[in-house]
Amino acid sequence: MDQTMTQASDKEASVADKLQYMPGFGNDFETETLPGALPQGQNSPQKCNYGLYAEQLSGSPFTAPRGTNERSWLYRIRPSVRHTRRFSNASYPHWKSAPCLDDHSLPLGQLRWGPMPVPDEKLSFLDGVRTMTTAGDVLTQTGMAAHVYVFNEDMVDDYAFNADGELLIVPQVGAIRVFTEMGIMDVEPLEIVLIPRGMMFKVLRKGDEKVWRGYICENYGAKFTLPDRGPIGANCLANPRDFKTPVAAYEDKEAPCRVHVKWCGKFYVTEIGHSPLDVVAWHGNYAPFKYDLRTFSPVGAILFDHPDPSIFTVLTAPTESAGTANVDFVIFPPRWLVAEHTFRPPWYHRNIMSEFMGLIHGQYDAKEEGFVPGGISLHNMMLPHGPDASGFEKASNSELKPVKLDHTMAFMFETRYPQQVTKYAAELETLQDNYLECWDGLERRFDGTPGIK
């Protein structure tokens, strides 16, 4: 399969309108843009076809167990040692890393923000990242950071890789084209894309929006994988065949370019004379992918009670403690509500985990007002949360007939570590000072006498 990034610098590069992908999660893929570019029967021949260089990209230690051992072999125009020169310091002041204990006056509490404002200035994807929370420690490769992004300009001659973690990108407004070393992916709202740790990429705009906006989970820990299904069995939730990895593509461009690097929480930049996206063929299991959230097959209660939200886990990044995630990516998709004699929305809750929520589309069933597409809520560990007063009244008194919860897609980045709010988030103009008032109408009903009140 052949997709070649050309030297075109506009946002619609001259590649096939319909990009090609390989289905599967964690597969050992192989793909080449030119016939015979991929060596057969070995990884590192004395001389590669087409004058290419062989290079391995490792996503795990060499001695990791086979089931978690990840690496890919890349056959490229230049080796990666030519894609960096002497580094100089770079500044992205709004992109923070854990631990980030910013000095601000915002006290502890349940928090909610409206959508990110539209920028007045020109911003690329890298320029437009704004960190809302951090958790854990980037130096020990534990925890995560939750970001929002808003941009209106392409990365043309700018490229980046993140040595601190993998990037899970969740578009909310505007489709994006993600060029990586290993291929091209077009990603629209209601899809996600994952860029592995250390992989070179750039992000371009698709379509004619005024602004491109979304969310990012920067996972410092073990990489995202599919959760175990347990008694659910072999099917449902996120099925492996619905994950799409791009076929090989390369950009043969000789022009001044900049490579931006995030390493141990700091940023650096280096200048080179060519595109680093020059992989002509590759094989392996360390690769980017995209996933359409609309293909998630939810399970739920079909008689009574509301199940735990863990049944909506798309991806999980585990820790050494079984069942305790460094970070989970959870969605709340369209689904049927059929439980009898049951309060159907999510129940009131205090949790050891810390929950960062966003809304891609529609309305969230536990919050009918205030939580809007592009917005954010943060419920840190052991802080109570649950349906607002109007949602409680509606769910407590509605007829319990089958109802389809439709035209909605909320998500959650949930971590075992407390999420520290950044100074930027604490002072953001869209912070809703009246959020706690959504529970003010939940009055005492108990009077000591038996009966349903």
Curated annotation (Swiss-Prot):
It catalyses: homogentisate + O2 = 4-maleylacetoacetate + H(+). Its cofactor is Fe cation. The active site is at 306 (proton acceptor). It holds the Pfam family HgmA_C. Fe cation binds at residues 349, 355, 385. Keywords: Dioxygenase, Iron, Metal-binding, Oxidoreductase, Phenylalanine catabolism, Tyrosine catabolism. Its EC number is 1.13.11.5. PANTHER family: HOMOGENTISATE 1,2-DIOXYGENASE. Involved in the catabolism of homogentisate (2,5-dihydroxyphenylacetate or 2,5-OH-PhAc), a central intermediate in the degradation of phenylalanine and tyrosine. Catalyzes the oxidative ring cleavage of the aromatic ring of homogentisate to yield maleylacetoacetate. This is Homogentisate 1,2-dioxygenase. The gene is hmgA.
